[in-house]
Regions:
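Active-site nucleophile/metal-coordination loop of metallo-enzymes that catalyze phosphate/sulfate
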Residues: 1-79
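A post-motif C-terminal structural segment
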Residues: 1-3, 65-322
Length: 322
């Protein structure tokens, strides 16, 4: 999705700001076979090269993941992090803040430091106290935690990362281009986790508020907010919920407000405590207890490390994973 936003060209699944290969009659939009696999200049790159603007990326996924990569790298395979990461490091981005501390190659880190960048890995205070203009600050080995699960002493919020990036980038009198992504809204949707979706979307909303606050004060800044593709099909009013239109707001949403962890956070918590604590965990972090059927389903999950059921007897038909 971001490849199309950044380049103005239609794309194919897995391509990172790269001209798509011609697929004959299957192409909805005509393509030039001679241009297949050519790198496509992104808005971010054009802002730097043609207008001298500063550029930055803020996100919560790992930095070579699709959206940050679509702004600042080129590949016909989004999974080739070993191709993408060095491109991003050598693209002279002024500010990069997000996940993926383990994915920055040694050569790329040396290049950044040799060119005057502050490079911080899992160092929230280092990021906060750095007075230089150019900076990479990466947290977690790969993606950062969902906002609801986040330890604020270890990982900054999307809003804080946005404010830091704007403060540094706005020093350039020629202006700046900054891409901010609430990366895991989409991930929660893929996981059918409404709590993760809602809370990370609210975290993104607060980051948008920081951007709009600056834009109002500055008077010369455009803020554009766009969605990723939709997925999971979350809805209110399916046939599984007759009479939904007569339910109160609390009946529809109150249970969500009791959750203190996302589905991912729950999985980690349950795997870190003995099986005897499962019901206590659900009472404390979700406001309800599991039924006997639900507890049996949990115990049969193939990824549940503390299940009393032998692994060879788990992951049976109809059972899932954490």
């Amino acid at each position: 999705t971001t490849s199309c936003y950044m380049t103005g060209y239609p794309s194919r699944t897995g391509y990172v700001s790269t001209y798509p290969e011609n697929d004959g009659n299957n192409d909805i939009y005509p393509t030039d076979p001679k241009r297949a696999f050519q790198p496509l200049t992104t808005v971010l790159e054009a802002a730097k090269m043609t207008q001298g603007k500063s550029t930055g990326l803020v996100f919560t996924c790992e930095f070579p993941h699709a959206t940050p990569a679509d702004c600042s790298a080129h590949s016909y395979n989004r999974g080739k992090y070993e191709w993408i990461a060095p491109q991003m490091a050598h693209n002279d981005l002024n500010v990069v803040i997000g996940g993926g501390a383990s994915l920055l190659p040694e050569e790329s880190e040396a290049y950044l430091k040799g060119n005057g960048y502050g490079v911080f890995k899992n160092d929230i205070n280092g990021m906060r106290n750095y007075n230089g203009d150019n900076m990479w600050a990466l947290f977690a080995d790969r993606e950062m935690a969902y906002d609801l699960d986040r330890d604020p002493a270890q990982q900054p919020s999307l809003e804080e990362m946005t404010r830091i990036a704007i403060k540094k980038l706005s020093k350039n009198p020629e202006g700046f281009f900054l891409m901010v992504e609430g990366s895991k809204v989409d991930w929660a949707a893929h996981a059918n986790d409404p709590v993760g979706m809602a809370t990370d979307f609210l975290a993104y909303d607060r980051a948008c508020g920081a951007a709009l606050e600056f834009a109002r004060q500055n008077g010369e800044t455009a803020v554009i907010m766009v969605p990723d593709h939709g997925n999971s099909g979350i809805s209110i009013g399916s046939y599984s919920c007759p009479g939904y239109d007569k339910l109160t707001k609390d009946q529809l949403f109150h249970q969500f407000s009791l959750y203190k962890l996302t589905a991912e956070g729950f999985a980690k918590k349950v795997n870190s405590e003995p099986n005897s604590e499962v019901q206590n965990i659900f009472r404390e972090y979700a406001g309800f207890e599991l039924t006997a059927e639900e507890l049996d389903a949990l115990n049969h999950c193939k990824d549940y490390k503390n299940s009393p059921i032998p692994e060879s007897e788990r992951a049976t038909e109809g059972k899932g994973s954490l």
